[in-house]
Amino acid sequence: MAQQRRGGRRRRKVDYIAANHIEYIDYKDTDLLRRFISERGKILPRRVTGTSAKNQRKLTVAIKRARIMGLLPFVAED
């Protein structure tokens, strides 16, 4: 039997921050930061979110600041 090929071209993920013209990622903007955190509280990687390297670094700093200030959890509660 011949194998069937599946799939096709995957759609390229769009950088949410660049697409919405967000220049400064504020650590107090928890609604924005929660988009880039998993349900367990971990920072999502670039390959999942589609952010650029520059914006991923800015996001990481903002998320870590928000965690230290107590605005975001370090780990999710069960």
From Swiss-Prot:
Entries under Gene3D superfamilies matching the protein: Ribosomal protein S18
Lipoprotein listed as a keyword: no
Superkingdom field: Bacteria
Record carries keyword Transcription: no
MF GO annotations: small ribosomal subunit rRNA binding; structural constituent of ribosome
Keyword terms of this UniProt record: Ribonucleoprotein, Ribosomal protein, RNA-binding, rRNA-binding
GO cellular component terms attached to this protein's record: cytosolic small ribosomal subunit
GO biological process: translation
Database matches in InterPro entries: Ribosomal_bS18, Ribosomal_bS18_CS, Ribosomal_bS18_sf
Subunit structure: Part of the 30S ribosomal subunit. Forms a tight heterodimer with protein bS6.
Family according to the record: Belongs to the bacterial ribosomal protein bS18 family.
Function comment: Binds as a heterodimer with protein bS6 to the central domain of the 16S rRNA, where it helps stabilize the platform of the 30S subunit.
Protein name: Small ribosomal subunit protein bS18
Source species of the chain: Ligilactobacillus salivarius (strain UCC118)
Lineage, opening ranks: Bacteria, Bacillati, Bacillota, Bacilli, Lactobacillales
Gene for this chain: rpsR
